[in-house]
Amino acid sequence: MLFCITANYTPKALEAMGKNPKTNRREAVEKLVTAGGGKLVAMYGTIAEGPGAMVIFEADPAVAPAIAAVAASSDGVSNVKMQRLLSGDEVRAIRQKRVELQKSYSPPSK
């Protein structure tokens, strides 16, 4: 399954990267993801909510939250969020299941 983690760099991390602008965080991220049996798919820098990173990785759904927790526990990032990414086929299957389930539900007001 695919997951996406987004996070903002802390002032401490930005200061460290300013002192060593050639630093490569991808290697550290890849090591963490592969230690959990996953695969790093992509890593991007982000600027929308301040300097940060977006990591897309493949992992077992029981392990992905642990990977996010390790990242969140570092003092280099804040505002860590993880999402499960769904393919178009998965979204269509969810919509179909919703239609089936809707037939068996009636809101309390009815």
Where on the chain are the PLM-derived regions?
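Short connector loops at helix/strand junctions that flank enzyme active sites
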Residues: E49-G52, V77
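Short S/T/G/P-rich N-terminal loop/turn motif that feeds into the first structured element of a domain
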Residues: M1-T34, K39-V41, T46-G50, A62-P65, ...
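An amphipathic, aromatic/His-enriched active-site/gating alpha helix that lines ligand/cofactor pockets
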Residues: E58-D89
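Short cationic amphipathic helices and targeting signals
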Residues: G52-E58
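A structural signal for short, well-ordered beta-strand segments
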Residues: I5-A7, V55, M82
